[in-house]
């Protein structure tokens, strides 16, 4: 073997480029922490997450790779606290923000390290990258104010990364804007210093400065709006006293029920079952849809009109459920005003459908992971912030959800931005596909499709 220019042979090792010593196995996290000669990091420095690194490389081995982009403040390889084993990822903080941006631009998914099948991941850590605590919504601006005016207003509070005035299609200002600062502290300082502090020229009230809504909050709000549009139903506050809890639940789900009932293949029997299904989700199966006093005529032997409330749960000409004249004894405690409820009565032809939903289902059974064939959906392009709870809330208006799961990376505990939802019937699954496939959340559009049957690829 030829000698190296310095007169000594290179060390032998399994890797052609990066043959370094492995990290110690003391457990927890071992780090390359700043010494006395290392300057403090900038106030707007970014903490980076580095993934897809060989498990044989420690901080000293990785340092030369990242130092070419700037001075490193801290580099920490993540290790299992119990076993001390390398997790294949690390956290990296540069002294300067620009260094982090350069490293991300040059390395993220651009280079594959020896022994790895996927390119290295270099991106802001979860707590840093979303910018949810740095992006502000600014309302009650003057119509004549542009981006430069807004920048001058917020410049004293720190470094502004983005500034966008919202405009109508004709180019006129909507009187509001988004401002994104370099750090959470700068954003909070701007809120404290400017919110309600002045009234801008041409504005009707004082300046509004607050944290902008997250993608998750916007998505859930759009879902609520869409549910109302599907049913062409506009709920209004009703002074119903003891009826409030019941009618609120009915109002919230009536629009989704109407949309589902009008879908292909759902007849009147299934519509009645769907009524009970949606009411059961709010623990209303064992109780009446409305207290007897609020839905009976003065004579007590027929349904009466409730001001401001449409006939409850009527679908495609199928009438609402008719109350019986006899109430359920011993159930006065369900109401604060002591009004006894009545049991819902069904035509005998629909008894099988109602029986299927007579028991209140739990929201997510732990043992049942999938629904029947044709009821299981794959959802792609979910927002990074979405968890299981948000996924359930998004798809619950379309039917009873058997299970919902967002897939998470085991090493980083970050969402992989896809998951699955299982319904208990194919109609709900098809309705969800029609409504949600292509639905935009943030900068992405959801892709919703049926999961392939397990035996789809098996030869006959």
From Swiss-Prot:
Places the protein is found: Nucleus; Cytoplasm
GO biological process, one term: vocalization behavior
GO molecular function, one term: RNA binding
Low complexity composition-biased segments: 1-10
CDD domains: RRM1_CELF3_4_5_6 (cd12632), RRM2_CELF3_4_5_6 (cd12635), RRM3_CELF3_4_5_6 (cd12639)
Pfam families (UniProt xref): RRM_1
Keywords from the UniProt entry: Cytoplasm, mRNA processing, Nucleus, Repeat, RNA-binding
Polar residues composition-biased segments: 319-336
Annotated spans, Disordered: 1-37, 316-336
Domain RRM residues, every copy: 46-127, 134-214, 375-453
Cellular compartments per GO CC: cytoplasm; nucleus; synapse
Residue pairs linked by disulfide bridges in the UniProt entry: none
PANTHER family to which the protein is assigned, alphabetical: RNA BINDING PROTEIN (PTHR24012)
Function noted in UniProt: RNA-binding protein implicated in the regulation of pre-mRNA alternative splicing. Mediates exon inclusion and/or exclusion in pre-mRNA that are subject to tissue-specific and developmentally regulated alternative splicing. Specifically activates exon 5 inclusion of TNNT2 in a muscle-specific splicing enhancer (MSE)-dependent manner. Promotes also exon exclusion of INSR pre-mRNA.
Family membership: Belongs to the CELF/BRUNOL family.
Protein name: CUGBP Elav-like family member 6
